[in-house]
From Swiss-Prot:
This is Uncharacterized protein C4H3.14c. One of its GO terms (cellular component) is cytosol. It comes from Schizosaccharomyces pombe (strain 972 / ATCC 24843). One of its GO terms (biological process) is conjugation with cellular fusion. Residues 324-345 have a biased composition (Polar residues). Residues 304-323 have a biased composition (Acidic residues). Residues 1-24, 296-345 are annotated as: Disordered.
Length: 345
């Protein structure tokens, strides 16, 4: 049942209590009336009937008519009062029965009231639990809403950051393309400048030709040594049964040819190593020049036109100096190699 039903039941119980109290008062009143009638009846019987015949009546042998009428009247009144008393007794019994019924109904209603109070307490506790659960759920929902709001704000910030990074990436790609184009242009200019320097440097051409002649001379020498070894080997085979002196001469010639071949091969190996070292130095110088050109490219992007021209001239002069240094080292190495070959020959 709900709260309204319990309140209605309480009101009905109060009405029953009031009815019981009213009935109690009525019963008490009727009981008092019955007691009064009984007392009056007893008094009348004791006065007129239980008293007996008076002495003057016995002497005369007669009664006054008024006394008989009075007795009859009193008897009638007593009968009437008895009937009234019986009625009152019946009513009293009925009222007692009603009182018992009302008390039973009251007890039932009290039991129902207690049950309703227990149900009300249970419902109240359940409502309180529901309210607490609703408050907790509301708090959790508010926390989720706050987290969702924070995530949405963070998502918006990330979108803005992504857009900014994309714009920066596009700008960086554009700048990179421009730098690549500038680099290609500078490399082309550097190649043209290097070719121009090589073209206008007769000493370098002469050294290259000298190196080619040296290689040809070494090749001819090795070819001659191989042919001499073959020529010396043929009479050795033909004169297997000749004297020991001839064999020793031939063996000595072969040993000398082998030693000469070893010396030439070792010299050529050393010469090739020196040549590779010189070429590595030249490559390093060229790479340094390219790095300086890259630095010049970066510097060109940040400096004014007038300053760029001065720096460009300085870097070109330094590059020419490095190339001249490499060429001079290469020429020195070639000259020393030629001298060594001539001394060995």
């Amino acid at each position: 049942m709900g709260l309204e039903g319990s309140e209605k039941l309480e009101h009905e119980i109060e009405q029953v209590h009031d009815n019981i109290e009213n009935r109690k008062e009525e019963v008490s009143t009727l009981q008092d009336m019955a007691n009064d009638l009984e007392k009056l009846t007893d008094h009348i019987e004791a006065t007129y009937i239980g008293r007996g015949v008076p002495h003057d009546h016995a002497k005369t042998g007669s009664r006054k008519p008024s006394s008989g009428q009075l007795i009859a009247t009193m008897q009638n009144e007593i009968d009437r009062l008895k009937k009234e008393g019986d009625k009152v007794s019946i009513l009293l019994m009925q009222e007692r029965k009603k009182r018992k019924e009302l008390e039973s109904a009251k007890n039932n209603l009290l039991n129902v009231y207690d049950s309703l109070k227990m149900q009300k307490a249970s419902v109240s506790s359940m409502v309180n639990r529901k309210q607490r659960a609703a408050k907790e759920e509301q708090k959790i929902q508010e926390e989720f809403e706050r987290q969702i709001t924070d995530l949405l704000e963070e998502q918006q910030q990330l979108k803005l950051e992504i857009e900014r990074l994309e714009a920066e990436t596009e700008r960086a790609n554009s700048e990179t393309e421009q730098y690549e184009k500038q680099k290609e242009a500078l490399e082309e200019e550097y190649e043209e400048l290097r070719n121009e320097c090589l073209k206008h440097d007769p000493q370098l051409d002469a050294e290259i030709r000298t190196l080619q002649d040296t290689f040809e001379e070494v090749e001819r020498t090795l070819t001659k040594q191989v042919s001499d070894a073959k020529i010396a080997d043929k009479p050795l085979k033909d004169s297997m049964f000749n004297s020991n002196s001839e064999k020793e001469k031939i063996m000595h010639a072969l040993e000398k040819a082998e030693k000469d071949a070893d010396i030439y091969s070792e010299f050529i190996q050393q010469y090739m190593e020196q040549l590779e070292s010189s070429l590595e130095k030249s490559s390093t110088a060229i790479e340094n020049a390219q790095n300086r050109l890259a630095e010049m490219t970066a510097h060109l992007a940040e400096s004014s036109d007038y300053d760029n021209d001065d720096d460009t001239d300085g870097i070109i002069n330094e590059t020419d100096y490095e190339l001249d240094t490499s060429q001079s080292e290469f020429a020195t190495l070639t000259t020393s190699s030629n001298k060594s070959i001539l001394n060995e020959s």
